[in-house]
Curated annotation (Swiss-Prot):
Protein name (Swiss-Prot/TrEMBL): Succinate--CoA ligase [ADP-forming] subunit beta
Source species of the chain: Syntrophotalea carbinolica (strain DSM 2380 / NBRC 103641 / GraBd1)
Position of the signal peptide: none
Organism placement in taxonomy: Bacteria, Pseudomonadati, Thermodesulfobacteriota, Desulfuromonadia, Desulfuromonadales
Pathway: Carbohydrate metabolism; tricarboxylic acid cycle; succinate from succinyl-CoA (ligase route): step 1/1
Family that this chain belongs to: Belongs to the succinate/malate CoA ligase beta subunit family.
Keyword GTP-binding tagged: no
Length: 388
């Protein structure tokens, strides 16, 4: 779960990380009032869950209240398209209005989950305000990565070493060490998968300040992060993803045309891999879970079919806790309810498989059965692309 910049900065402020003075505005009038508090000279930032706002016109430096209001009229209640949003863009429901802070130099600092090592990793660079991956490619010596031993944690001597790498000394080194340790505490206590400051700036007054902030919370930890869950902005999610979340269905929209309905995250990922191996493009990741009942399968199938990009469906079910005949009944009910004419290829294994197969073969719907995953993936790809 991603946080908005203003939410991330609010969180950082609690942990003693310096941030610019700012105000949240949800209307043109509130934007004008916020700008007036800074005598009209401020930065107006669109709040969306994507980067690239500056180049897309979502961040503007203004010198008057009228300019701030004009920016608000252009951005609020509209969608902002950036390099990271796709063509559909993201809805702008609020603006962060901040003081203008003169900056002497910019750095980069983040803590993220290194999934390859199964550990947290600190990433730092004396070059901030830019894409860290681009910096790592062009000048790898300008990027320091520190893998954190979970039994040791991030210690003060680690923080001091990173501060030296950033080129800081004296009071700024001490301030940077404090920021690094506070950021690590925030990461752990909020079950975050990413906390990022880009840029971490040294102001012309010689102070350290987080000019931009990014935080992502582990979705699996939201049950114990009640406040973070309350900060969820559903306007930043695809409508079908919101609907799926309310039904406890794991659904992620993708760019392909083959809808996938699977039980179990591992099996779902294997299904996507097999589809790609066979030349197909999945339209979604959809995991109904191991204990789904017929009603949940019906809702999952309806969500899948409401994506206009879906041209065919691949169903891959392992009947352990779930019975294949109940899944078959759910598929048939859902397809009949929505009047589905799309080709559907089903592969099932496990409890009451033969009964499920019999039910599907008796229906008049465009459903075909395959015994293996590779055969099922190949079948749906060939139905949609006969030349494949």
């Amino acid at each position: 779960m991603k946080l908005h910049e203003y939410q991330a900065k609010q969180l950082f402020h609690r942990y003693g990380i310096p941030i610019p003075e700012g105000r949240l505005a949800r209307s043109v009038e509130e934007t004008g009032q916020a700008a007036r508090a800074f005598a009209g000279r401020c930065v107006v930032k669109a709040q969306i869950h994507a980067g690239g706002r500056g180049k897309a016109g979502g961040v503007a430096r203004v010198n008057s209240v009228d300019q701030a209001r004009n920016i608000a009229q252009r951005l609020l209640q509209h969608t902002l398209v950036t390099a990271q949003t796709g063509d559909q863009g993201l809805y702008v429901g609020s603006l962060l209005v901040e003081e203008i802070v003169p900056v002497a130099r910019e750095m980069y600092l983040s803590l993220t989950l290194d999934r390859a090592n199964g550990r947290y990793c600190l990433i730092a660079s004396p070059d901030g305000g830019v894409d860290i991956e681009q910096t790592a490619r062009k000048t790898p010596e300008r990027v320091r990565r520190l893998t954190i031993d979970p039994l040791v944690g991030l210690r003060a001597f680690h923080a001091r070493d990173i501060a030296r790498f950033l080129g800081l000394d004296g009071p700024l080194s001490a301030a940077a060490s404090k920021v690094i340790l506070s950021l690590y505490r925030c990461l752990l206590e909020k079950d975050a998968s990413l906390v990022e400051i880009n840029p971490l700036a040294v102001t012309e007054e010689g102070r350290l300040m987080a000019m931009d902030a990014k935080v992502s919370i582990d979705d699996s930890a939201l049950f114990r992060q009640k406040e973070m869950l309350e900060w969820l902005d559903e306007s930043q999610l695809a409508p079908l993803e919101v609907r799926a979340a309310h039904s406890d269905i794991a659904y992620i929209k993708m760019d392909g045309c083959i809808g996938c309905l699977v039980n179990g995250a591992g099996l779902a990922m294997a299904t996507l891999d097999m589809l790609s191996e066979c030349g197909g493009q999945p339209a979604n990741f959809l995991d109904v879970g191991g204990g789904a009942d017929q009603d949940k399968v019906v809702e999952a199938f309806r969500i899948l079919l409401e994506d206009p990009a879906v041209e065919g469906v691949l169903v891959n079910i392992f009947g352990g806790i779930m019975r294949c005949d109940l899944i078959a009944q759910g598929l048939i009910a859902a397809a009949e309810q929505v009047g589905c004419q799309l080709p559907i290829v089903v592969r099932m294994a496990g409890a009451r498989r033969d009964e499920g197969k019999h039910l599907l073969q008796q229906t008049q719907l465009n459903i075909s059965w395959q015994d293996g995953l590779a055969a099922a993936a190949t079948a749906i790809v060939r139905q949609l692309s006969p030349s494949a």
